[in-house]
Structures are given as C-alpha cells and as structure tokens.
Amino acid sequence: MKSIHGFLLFLITAYVILESVQAQDQLGFISLDCGLVPKNATYTEKTTNITYKSDANYIDSGLVGRISAEYKAQLQQQTWTVRSFPEGERNCYNFNLTAKSRYLIRATFTYGNYDGLRQVPKFDIHIGPSKWTSVKLDGVGNGAVLEMIHVLTQDRLQICLVKTGKGIPFISSLELRPLNNNTYLTQSGSLIGFARVFFSATPTFIRYDEDIHDRVWVRQFGNGLKSISTDLLVDTSNPYDVPQAVAKTACVPSNASQPLIFDWTLDNITSQSYVYMHFAEIQTLKDNDIREFNITYNGGQNVYSYLRPEKFEISTLFDSKPLSSPDGSFSLSFTKTGNSTLPPLINGLEIYKVLDLLELETDQDEVSAMINIKATYDLSKKVSWQGDPCAPKSYQWEGLNCSYPNSDQPRIISLNLAENKLTGTITPEISKLTQLIELDLSKNDLSGEIPEFFADMKLLKLINLSGNLGLNSTIPDSIQQRLDSKSLILILSKTVTKTVTLKGKSKKVPMIPIVASVAGVFALLVILAIFFVVRRKNGESNKGTNPSIITKERRITYPEVLKMTNNFERVLGKGGFGTVYHGNLEDTQVAVKMLSHSSAQGYKEFKAEVELLLRVHHRNLVGLVGYCDDGDNLALIYEYMANGDLKENMSGKRGGNVLTWENRMQIAVEAAQGLEYLHNGCTPPMVHRDVKTTNILLNERYGAKLADFGLSRSFPVDGESHVSTVVAGTPGYLDPEYYRTNWLSEKSDVYSFGVVLLEIVTNQPVTDKTRERTHINEWVGSMLTKGDIKSILDPKLMGDYDTNGAWKIVELALACVNPSSNRRPTMAHVVTELNECVALENARRQGREEMHTSGYVDFSRSSASEFSPGAR
C-alpha cells in the first residue's frame, strides 16, 4: 500500500537549481515573474530554459519586493521577487485569452521575509469571482505552489489575491500553460492539482521541457513498489502528451501476487476526485505471459475491468464521473485477474480535486466596457475596481449597482462616476452597458457633445451630466424625443444655458425654466431613489426579477405592429391563441403572436403572460420584447426563434437534418432548466401548466427555450405545496392526478415534462389509437419489459447514442410520469440527471471513436458487464 500526499507540498523542490535543459517551443506559455522590474524586463531561467517576463502589464496595483538573500541561493530566479498588495481588499491579474480554452494555471508563493517582518501572511486566491483556495505557508523560508486546470468561460481570465485580515497578500510567479481541449474532461467545475506522480529511481521530478505542457511530475517510490523501465521509445501520441520519461518507467508490486494500492485523503470530506491513469506495457512478454488486471476503489467499487496495457503505447484512462467518498479518504486498487501471469503496473498517475466555481461572472461585454472605461478615464487608483465588476457581491465595484438574476449572469444597472475628475468626451463604451438604468457623470471636466447613443439605451431612465462646464449642452433630437415622452430624465448644470435642438435648429434656452422642469420631475427622482433603496434591500429575495423593467416601456401600438410585420406578410405558425407572424423591430427579428378574436385564450390569459414575462428572465425562457394592447388588438412580441418548435423538428416538418442524440439531450436539459427556474427561481414560484414539445422553441443554434405562459399560475409562498384551480392544459400531457383532484402543484409540470422526454427519445406521438397501449407512457413501459431499449428509441438515430445514457433518460422520464405526484422527482433533480446524460454523450463522442485511435479510454463505460444493461 502506498500513501500519496498532495504533490503541491513538494513542488517547491522543482524550483531549486538543476542542470540546464534544452529549450523547446513555448508557444502559448505565459510565464510571469511577479515584481520583476522594469516592466519590459525578460530573462530565461537557465535550469528550465523557460522565458519569464515582468507581470507589470497584467496588473495595475501592488508593490514590488525581493526575498532575503539567505533564501535565494537554491531557488530559481522567478521566486526571487514578489508583488504584494497592501492596498485594497482584492487585487487582480487580467489575461486576454480565448473562451473555452483549457489551461494549467500555476501560482507560486515564496515569502522569504521580503518585508523584513518574519510574519507569514494568510490570504485567499480567487479564479474570476470564485474562491480557488486559501494560501497558507509553513514558515518564513518555505514556499507553496498551487495548480489548477481550468476552462475559460469568457475571453478574459482574472486571478485575484484577496485579503482575509491575516496579513498582506503577495505572489512570486504566475504561469499559464495551454492544454489540449479534449483532455482532463469533467462533468463540471475545475480541477485542483493534488498529485501527479511517476515511478522511477531517478530523477526526483520531471517538468518542462521533458513535459511539453510544463506539468510537474514528482517521483513516487517506496516500500511495496518495484520500478521497471525500458530503453525503447514508447508511443505517447495521445492528447495527454505523457513525457517519455514517465512512459518509459512503471511500477509493479514488490510481491507479484499482491495488488497495487494507492491511498489519499482530501482535506474536505465532501470533495470529489478525478483520477487520470497512464498505462503502457514496457516489458517484452513471453508467448504465455498475460498482464491483465481490474481497477477498483474504496473496497471494490468498479472502475475498469480486465485491463491489458498496450505494448509500448500509452493509454490514458479516466472516468467521466468523479470519485466520491463519505469521509474524504480514497483507496485505488489494481488487482491482477485469474488469467494473469504478471502483476499489475502503472506508468503515471494524476489525482485532482473538483472545485465547483459557484459565482457567475458578469456579462462579458459589460466587463470589457468597464475595463475600457477604467482605462479611458485613468481610474486605476480606484482600489475597489479590481476583478469582476459585480461578483462576488461583496466585492462589487464602488459606484456600481448590479442585478443578480437567479441562474444568470450579473448585470450592471447603475454607474456613478460623479466627482472623479473625468476629462475628455463621454466614452461610447457606456453604450455597452445595455441594462443601465441610472448614469451619474456629474461634477467632472467632461467636454464634447452629449452622445446620441443615450437615446438607444432603452432601459436608461436617468442621466446626470451637471457640473461639466465644458460639455456642449446641445441635446440631440433622438434624446429630446425621449425627454418629451418622459421615458428619460436628463439633468444638466444649473449655472449654464443648455441648447435644445428643435426641428433641426439650435435654440438657446435659459436654464431657469430647465431647473423648474427638473423641479417638476423631482417627484420622479424621489420615486427612483426609493426604487433603488428597495432594490438594494431586497436584491437577494428578487433574484428572479429584473428591476429595470418599466411596463409601459414595452408597450407597442397597433400601427407599429403593422409596420414591423409588413402588414402581416409572413406567417410563422398558427395555434389556439391565433397566428404568429415574422417581424422586424429596429433591425432585430421578432415573432409577433396576434390574439384571434375567436381565441379560447382571452384577455385574462394574455394579461397573465405579459405580466409574467415582464418580470421573469432566464436564458431558457423565451424573452418578451414587447406587447400590444390597443383596443381590440392584442399581440405578444417575442424574441425570434429561428428553428421553430421541438415538435416540428422531431417530426421532420421543417426538413433538414435529424436531431442527433446530442442535440436532443442538450434541448432536454435546457428546457428543464427553464422549467426549474419557474419552480425555484421566481418569487412567487410559478407552475407553467402547459409543458409540451410545441412550447419548446429552438434558436438558430438549436438552443431550447420554454414558451407560452398564458396558463401559468403563481405558486403559494406560505409553505403550501399546491393550489386548487380549474383544470387547464393539453390532453396527453395533463397530469392525471391534477385532472382528477383539481390540485395543481409543481409536480404537474414534472409529469408533462416526463411526457416530453419520452417524445424526445422515441419520436412517437403522445397518443396513438393504433397502438395497443395508446398513451406513450404505457407503450414505453410495456416495451421495456422486454429488456430491449433499442425497440423504443427513434430509429432515425441509427443507433448513434449512448446506451447507458438512453436507459438513464427513459428511467427518469418514467419516474416523472409516475401516477402519484409524491413519487415524482423535482425539476432540480431532473436537471441534475439530464446533465449527467449530456456528460455521458459528450464523453462518448469525444471518447470512444477517438480513443480507439488515439490511445486513451474513458473507462466509465468500458466494462461491458456494467454498461450494457439488459432487462431492468
């Protein structure tokens, strides 16, 4: 048995002086010596031939320092200097990269008494707005190295040092190494490095340039292990790029009849592990020799069965699901089978801890805008303006207010830059803050024109430009129109004359009447002030609402409807509500649903849908652009969904390609997320009441959004689990318990969604009188008794799906349509299960075909006995 300790405890040894190595391509490497001066300085570390540069171009705060000479002698040069952060609570490095790229991130901390205090600080490090870990050093002369594998969600990465009240944060070096995007796959979260080991008598560790990704491999050896090696080259041409020095050595148990066992313990008992194992047969076997073994963990839980390593070719095995343990302790066993004449072996082992990043990043365009505003007006001295502008909420930038919609990115809704000595013109970057309600640029030295883009910021209600004596107060026509319609308040200086542009002419107007006008709208300002106070106090309880919505702002007249639809020229579809037309509103495509005068859905349902969509916003709910309530003319104007509804796409009515299994799984999880938001993210919660495939719409990328909320009902907030109501919905999708009792609950939606899931996987009608079992629920249940899932899956899929995932989703659907609502899962549980199905399909597509040729295997589905289910 071999106990594996966190290799990061030993990584600091990788920074001691070693023999020089040959340089290789460092394409994509970012290697920062933190505190190196001057800012354009670079050098090549002679022991690794890695080129380091100053960090000054990646951060605009902090002080530079140097560790004491007594600690430098045996350390590599990038640890000799530090950057410390005595000012501000959070200080951040900024990297412009590419979204969805995968990086190995390494941060090094060597205190070395750089400040002469001999007091080791404690602080946190964040990745974006989420905490990575706490930095704790064992002593003045000791260092720490942290590693993470992270997939970028935006084109920008921020790494932040955060105070915890226990000293001043600092950092010695920061390194980013690009990885292949089809490696280190996870269901969710990032990976914190725990161990990366190889098995050889020498050397003690391996890194660049033997490892082209500059991963640090620490030698693991001791009692119970025997090292074997080869001088022959091993084929390492799989995406993990295992170094030859790792591939050409391996360990076997000293006692050939005993298993190999590796133990490790995570400090948090709730943490999960991902394990990546690298195998190659590096001994020349005799004709009657067999090396075959099983891999299990924690007392027999199967990981992989009957493994035979490829001869002189590396295979990388990993599980698409993380390993878990009730107490944080893990034991990985390699045991030879009864057929094997040779003991198990392993060449390299990587262990990671899962880190779920809980904080959502602010909208990428708004982050870019704020960073550009900061640069334009030289606001680097604003100590709070570090990292993500809105997240986490406790580090929101000074002068900003943000909205925090549930399950969606934070958005900036007010910006106050009053009295900040701003000079120059008003930057167009402000126009990118599309959710802005209030803007205060007063008491600065701004000049130039009042920009017309203010008129296009539809949610903007208040602009304060007073106290900017150099600003030309000519008001553009487009802004004047908004002032006249009272949809915008503009405050200018009380001591200057403003120019109002009327009918193409400039006219000087004394400021006294303007001041009177401002006084006339003072009550509106008071209302706005109360609004912001209430919003701040109730931000958490109203995560599902958007405080920027002003109802009449979304109201559209009937002549405007005629114009946007070109007199109802193009029909998109027809339904019980009426006809849906294609339209264009300000160069944006929209769908216009006109209420038929003979429609069964009356004004009450129309009003209910408008009120719901005006306050509910989620990426998987169809957004309301506006509505028309003009006499007898009622219309809803939605965002345009280019690929129509799910039922059309399943039936082939729209033509085009058959929806793949991958498409279907993603559509299912996105629709489920929208429904789960209605149940758990809204205040009060909502029940949709009409979930069906025609109410799941698909955009141009086949992203799914839930639509048609005319039958939706509020859910009690006083602890009651249901309401009594008249039965409404669509036959076939209607919860039989609700139909029988008139008691409506969230589980009624769950039932309907279960029917949708069965449609997605079978492509069969919900009811079919030609079947012995007319309803799809009964038909699927009867077919499954034969134990052959292929007989119920859509034949158009041509067998191109993950069988294990198919079983999982069918069983989930049948649980949803259980006749008893108490035995149905919640939508939160449904979302979790569907995400696992998506992960299985992703692993299959990125795995089985590629892995067969590239030499690595996703072993979560490799045991035929475990992942080819028969009758259940």
From Swiss-Prot:
<dbReference type="InterPro" id="IPR001245">
    <property type="entry name" value="Ser-Thr/Tyr_kinase_cat_dom"/>
</dbReference>
<dbReference type="InterPro" id="IPR011009">
    <property type="entry name" value="Kinase-like_dom_sf"/>
</dbReference>
<dbReference type="InterPro" id="IPR024788">
    <property type="entry name" value="Malectin-like_Carb-bd_dom"/>
</dbReference>
<feature type="modified residue" description="Phosphoserine">
    <location>
        <position position="724"/>
    </location>
</feature>
<feature type="signal peptide">
    <location>
        <begin position="1"/>
        <end position="23"/>
    </location>
</feature>
<feature type="glycosylation site" description="N-linked (GlcNAc...) asparagine">
    <location>
        <position position="255"/>
    </location>
</feature>
<comment type="similarity">
    <text>Belongs to the protein kinase superfamily. Ser/Thr protein kinase family.</text>
</comment>
<keyword id="KW-0547">Nucleotide-binding</keyword>
<dbReference type="Pfam" id="PF12819">
    <property type="entry name" value="Malectin_like"/>
</dbReference>
<feature type="glycosylation site" description="N-linked (GlcNAc...) asparagine">
    <location>
        <position position="401"/>
    </location>
</feature>
<feature type="topological domain" description="Extracellular">
    <location>
        <begin position="24"/>
        <end position="513"/>
    </location>
</feature>
<feature type="active site" description="Proton acceptor">
    <location>
        <position position="690"/>
    </location>
</feature>
<protein>
    <recommendedName>
        <fullName>Probable LRR receptor-like serine/threonine-protein kinase At1g51880</fullName>
        <ecNumber>2.7.11.1</ecNumber>
    </recommendedName>
</protein>
<feature type="binding site">
    <location>
        <position position="593"/>
    </location>
    <ligand>
        <name>ATP</name>
    </ligand>
</feature>
<dbReference type="InterPro" id="IPR001611">
    <property type="entry name" value="Leu-rich_rpt"/>
</dbReference>
<feature type="glycosylation site" description="N-linked (GlcNAc...) asparagine">
    <location>
        <position position="181"/>
    </location>
</feature>
<dbReference type="GO" id="GO:0106310">
    <property type="term" value="F:protein serine kinase activity"/>
</dbReference>
<keyword id="KW-0597">Phosphoprotein</keyword>
<keyword id="KW-0472">Membrane</keyword>
<keyword id="KW-0433">Leucine-rich repeat</keyword>
<keyword id="KW-0723">Serine/threonine-protein kinase</keyword>
<feature type="modified residue" description="Phosphothreonine">
    <location>
        <position position="557"/>
    </location>
</feature>
<feature type="glycosylation site" description="N-linked (GlcNAc...) asparagine">
    <location>
        <position position="339"/>
    </location>
</feature>
<feature type="repeat" description="LRR 1">
    <location>
        <begin position="411"/>
        <end position="434"/>
    </location>
</feature>
<feature type="transmembrane region" description="Helical">
    <location>
        <begin position="514"/>
        <end position="534"/>
    </location>
</feature>
<feature type="binding site">
    <location>
        <begin position="572"/>
        <end position="580"/>
    </location>
    <ligand>
        <name>ATP</name>
    </ligand>
</feature>
<dbReference type="GO" id="GO:0004674">
    <property type="term" value="F:protein serine/threonine kinase activity"/>
</dbReference>
<feature type="repeat" description="LRR 3">
    <location>
        <begin position="459"/>
        <end position="482"/>
    </location>
</feature>
<feature type="glycosylation site" description="N-linked (GlcNAc...) asparagine">
    <location>
        <position position="268"/>
    </location>
</feature>
<keyword id="KW-0808">Transferase</keyword>
<keyword id="KW-0732">Signal</keyword>
<feature type="modified residue" description="Phosphothreonine">
    <location>
        <position position="730"/>
    </location>
</feature>
<dbReference type="InterPro" id="IPR032675">
    <property type="entry name" value="LRR_dom_sf"/>
</dbReference>
<keyword id="KW-0325">Glycoprotein</keyword>
<keyword id="KW-0812">Transmembrane</keyword>
<feature type="glycosylation site" description="N-linked (GlcNAc...) asparagine">
    <location>
        <position position="294"/>
    </location>
</feature>
<feature type="glycosylation site" description="N-linked (GlcNAc...) asparagine">
    <location>
        <position position="96"/>
    </location>
</feature>
<dbReference type="InterPro" id="IPR008271">
    <property type="entry name" value="Ser/Thr_kinase_AS"/>
</dbReference>
<keyword id="KW-1133">Transmembrane helix</keyword>
<dbReference type="InterPro" id="IPR000719">
    <property type="entry name" value="Prot_kinase_dom"/>
</dbReference>
<feature type="modified residue" description="Phosphotyrosine">
    <location>
        <position position="738"/>
    </location>
</feature>
<dbReference type="GO" id="GO:0016020">
    <property type="term" value="C:membrane"/>
</dbReference>
